């Protein structure tokens, strides 16, 4: 399984929730190939400089594992082999995350897993909610010595 979707003219790690059904890049996967990406935390770097950016770890208050909303697809590589790929769905950030990054992963509630996976004529857009700040713990870890690419997106 590879992280990110590869298209003829584009590569993307994540999928924006806004417009997910309007874009031919993600529409079919959202309608037919929803998945979860288990995690116990995720990391973001607050981009202030080309390097030495503050690193944050984000968990849920219980510190239990949680499920990031995802979609998957099959990509045909140059050798002609089909490879499974996955992309995490992101939303606009809540007020706390907006201080660090302009997007945040969609976290699904356990009570919503069955609906997320259920085949449906109407994909569950309402589950792509912005997780409120009180449902996240954001902890500054360190300034991370990482050189950012000049054309990073």
Q: What is each of the regions a protein language model found here?
A:
Residues 1-153:
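Short linear sequence motif anchored by a di-proline
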């Amino acid at each position: 399984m590879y992280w990110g979707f590869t298209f003829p003219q584009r590569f993307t790690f994540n999928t924006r929730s806004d417009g997910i059904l309007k874009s031919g890049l993600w529409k079919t996967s959202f309608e037919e190939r929803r998945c979860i990406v288990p995690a116990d935390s995720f990391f973001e770097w607050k981009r202030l400089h080309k390097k030495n950016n503050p690193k944050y770890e984000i968990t849920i208050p219980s510190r239990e594992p949680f499920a990031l909303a995802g979609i998957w697809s099959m990509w045909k590589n140059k050798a002609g082999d089909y490879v499974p790929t996955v992309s995490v769905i992101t939303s606009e950030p809540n007020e706390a995350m907006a201080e660090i990054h302009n997007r945040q992963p969609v976290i699904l509630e356990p009570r919503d897993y069955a609906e997320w996976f259920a085949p449906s004529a109407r994909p569950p857009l309402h589950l792509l909610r912005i997780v409120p700040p009180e449902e996240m713990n954001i902890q500054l870890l360190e300034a991370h010595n990482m050189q950012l690419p000049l054309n990073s997106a």
